[in-house]
Amino acid sequence: LAGRQRSLVAPAHVQVLPPFNSRKHLPSRLNLLREMDGRSAVMVRGAGTEFDSLRQYVPGDDVRSIDWRSTARRGEVVVRTWRPERDRHVLIIIDSARHSATRMEEGTRLDVGIDSSFLLSALASAAGDRVEVMALDTRRRAWIAGKKSGELIAAMANELADVEPYLGELSAPALNLAASQRLSQHALVVLLSSLEAVSHDQALTDVLAMIAHKHTLIFASAINPQIEQMTHERDNADLAYQAAAAERTLLETNQACSQLKRLGIEVVEATPATLAPALADTYLALKAAGRL
């Protein structure tokens, strides 16, 4: 037996795209969106709604929705129907600073944030809203805007594929600049970050308060399951110290969560596996309430 081995140079570039694990939740949320549109078509006008169409009056309709001019013109009673406003501006900011490097289950906090942004972006674009996404730490690392619904997720995957956690804090001035430059009217701002980042940075809290004063702000943070587990392990001195540190972390994050809620910020806190659908549900609730 004889053999021959030879090496050939074959340069190539392979781009690893971030996974869209929460895609399985998209069909059910799209169904909820369609149901919401259907229900709102028979509701009276309210904040966050726009005129949809006219239809014939049926017993049980709210008399306040009667269009008297059209009724006189047609010779029959007709009512106005309304639907949630479309073409709202949704700005999603993914924190790519040092806290995004935290290990969570099979990935990092950054992976969880990117996956959650995929689901929310797909849902919001299907709802007719304008979606803009950026990764931010001390400066903007990625930016996706002006994409149609069918192109958005692919563009996000390509742009976010090269984003890695930056070993520094999320810059409050950079966040303030990003929001002020991209937003001229009321919008929905979603910050995918960590409560740990807020608990130690008063400047960041002040910027979030300013954004929440002008816009609807959602702060989404993934819970690290290991921290909760560490609080129950106290079999020796080392584990006891770890449990004390974990308890301290939970106390600080709970205080940060309460502070953000007092500022009028919607806080979404969930496990890595449930953060994406929880964020999508919060978006649907705000849209139904006309708060976008």
Task: Give the ranges of each region predicted by the language model.
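An amphipathic, basic-hydrophobic helix/alpha-beta surface used to engage anionic
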Residues: 1-151, 186-193, 199, 206-210
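Von Willebrand factor type A / integrin I
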Residues: 20-27, 34-37, 185, 199-292
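Short, flexible loop segments at the rims of nucleotide/cofactor-binding pockets, characterized by
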Residues: 69, 165-169, 196-197, 245
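Well-ordered alpha-helical segments embedded in enzymatic catalytic cores
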Residues: 116, 174-178, 203
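A glycine-rich phosphate-binding loop feature that marks nucleotide/adenosyl-phosphate handling sites
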Residues: 136-139, 177, 276
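Short, charged loop segments at secondary-structure junctions
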Residues: 143-171
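A glycine- and small/hydrophobic-rich beta-loop-beta segment
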Residues: 160-162, 176-183
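A general structural motif
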Residues: 167-177, 249
